[in-house]
């Protein structure tokens, strides 16, 4: 609580009130009694008075002195060339004074004086450093100049030696040429001398035969001597030429070696000069440069000159792995021992070295910038201290060439496998991963990119491994030691829709399959194996509707024999021709079954003629295709058909390995709500067991359950046996090859590769709106789109329905399949339909309760179909409603102009007679002059007498004016017409 009067303030200060009153009076504060009040101003005046009376000032409290120390290092070489590191400590003292209005000027003056003292010391130190640095730079410049002069002298000497060698070579060549010319001249003289002797010989022989016989030995002897002399001269010439060439080659090699040595010296001098220039351009504080390799021991004088400069500290012996001394250990060792270091002094331990040396050095000054401390002395070592614990920096070790391996990195690899490929410990790989910020274990999987980065970090060469090719795996599977055994034939039943394929198969299987198909037509591939008295046959029943072309092609691809079913009362139809084409393309033999022979209007002969026209010739006509007349209703001819099928199978000699990994074909695939992805597989070779890891396209997984065509569980399936498997990661595409893989990792690797490879194809099938499509739409004008989402029960039906709907697209209306998949209609499908304004088509599927509720809330249209005809027809009708209506002109009447009136503010008005039909007020009109159309427009007014009328019929007169047209002449004709819109259909 603040004191308000003199008595309270005296009690607070613990002094008598009378003494306080006296002090207040002395300070100029007039207070009469102890009860008088005191203000803050009175207290401040009292405080100032007491300070002045006691002689105390606040000058010391207003001044702060700061002392700053800065330690730096410089390197200096003495006269012997030893490099020394000198520590420089700069102490700066600065005083800050708190100024007020009265003493501002005095404070400034004192501050300047204090700073001036410090600045003088700093200035002197900087001048000394600058002078020292200038001396060093001048010394280095002189050294550089001397070295350049020496190089120039060496270059001049080399050129002189080359000129002398060249002159010697030319002189030798000239001498050899002179000798060669002299020898040739002597040979010519001998030849000329021999010619007269030969010419005179016949005459002498005729006159004196005895003398000629006596002279023959002398001539022969002379010619032999001449030949020997010429051979000796040629040998001497060759020897002289060879000596001249050897001398020239030796001179050239010597000159080249000298030139290379001079070039090396020049390059070293230029590098040193460039380094000096760079350091001269660097800031003054950046004095510690990355150490450079020490000079060769063969040049001690130059090494001494190169050491001990401000900008070039010498490098320790063990730091430069690429220095020349590393190649010659015997020469490097003396250099290391004979060059004393800058700080070498006798240690207390003498020559014992070891830990005492290290402790002594630690107690010394640790210079941060001195990376060398001498030529061959590191931080820990010294020439005297080579004991039991000598430092590695002072011990020469022969460099070992690191082994760089080429590591093939697959898509995924564990840490242990990667370390094994590089021949390093797994801990090294884990350390590298930790440096990159990832904590991994020894069994953790790494992706290819991360693994390649690790390989490069550890100094090896990483190569992306060639991805596993499923075709290569198939080839490897074929090269198997398993014995090939006979297998059942795979028979595909093909033909036109409603020709009785399924009924025929139904009779063979003794099961009512056709009754279960919607509309009585097959919309899936059915795979069954039937045990007959003659053997096992696997049947594939394919759809005959035109929409299922791809499904039929898959059936022909997997089959051995095709049964072509043709109705005897219908003949060859479009899908019959297509089935024949599929069978021929696959090189599959045909067995023709002429069905429905029990009908009254059956005509098998006509069917045979039509098939012959298609290239299918019966055996009775000299062909190779057996024709069997059957009736699926009565069972007539069924046994003959099976017998022909098995006969064809025996001819083909169908075999497959049984004790081998299975491979096959996906016949059909679907998404079951309780089972997940389900695929119908036809095993083509090997044996498929429950628990095997299978790969089907981009789907993979372990076979969790396996059912036969009757729905009964089975543990294994051999060749030509169809089974339904569960456990795949996703619904595979129908027609994909199925391969049994050795393990999950390999299967996942190939599946991920295929997913990445075919991602673009998948996106293209979804037909997302992209820039190209937008540009197409802009070029084509207004194009209407019908977005659809197609969900089907199986993959083949969904594929066939999508293809059929896409065929409905025209230039004006296009079908856009936003999404197509297998399975029930879910909430995500409804949300997608809401965003894309699409219609959902469910083919043999239904929406769950949540999806139906969401569709009702968002107004999404869901259509259900179980026959492909109905889906295609309704979409076609909806697309017809989206077409722009067609405009048609209907001529309603003809008018003849009898008279033309000019009306102010209106223009020309034609007095007309309706000669045919009628004229309406809202009609359009064409003006004909001499039967040529000169104008087309609309009526502006239609009057009869003075009244506006809506219609004037034939035989009546009227007045007409045309909008924006006044060039009306008597005798013109008006053709009156109306434009109507007519709905279009696809």
From Swiss-Prot:
Presence of the UniProt keyword Protein biosynthesis in the record: yes
Cellular component terms per the entry's GO annotation: cytosol
PROSITE patterns for this protein: G_TR_2 (PS51722), IF2 (PS01176)
Region: G1, residue numbers: 495-502
Location within or outside the cell: Cytoplasm
Predominant location category: cytoplasm
Residue span(s) of domain tr-type G: 486-655
Skewed-composition ranges (Gly residues): 371-384
Compositionally biased spans, kind Low complexity: 183-222, 320-342
Residue segments, region G3: 541-544
Binding site for GTP: 495-502, 541-545, 595-598
Region Disordered: start-end pairs: 95-394
Pfam family, one: EF-G_D2
Region feature (G5): 631-633
Coiled coil: none
Keywords from the named record: Cytoplasm, GTP-binding, Initiation factor, Nucleotide-binding, Protein biosynthesis
Basic and acidic residues composition bias: residue spans: 122-182, 228-277
Annotated region (G4), positions in chain: 595-598
Record-linked InterPro entries: DNA-bd_dom_put_sf, EF-G-like_DII, IF2_assoc_dom_bac, IF2_II, IF2_N, P-loop_NTPase, Small_GTP-bd, T_Tr_GTP-bd_dom
MF GO annotations: GTP binding; GTPase activity; translation initiation factor activity
Positions of the UniProt region annotated as G2: 520-524
Known role: One of the essential components for the initiation of protein synthesis. Protects formylmethionyl-tRNA from spontaneous hydrolysis and promotes its binding to the 30S ribosomal subunits. Also involved in the hydrolysis of GTP during the formation of the 70S ribosomal complex.
Protein family per UniProt: Belongs to the TRAFAC class translation factor GTPase superfamily. Classic translation factor GTPase family. IF-2 subfamily.
Protein name in UniProt: Translation initiation factor IF-2
Organism of origin: Paraburkholderia phytofirmans (strain DSM 17436 / LMG 22146 / PsJN) (Burkholderia phytofirmans)
Gene, per the UniProt record: infB
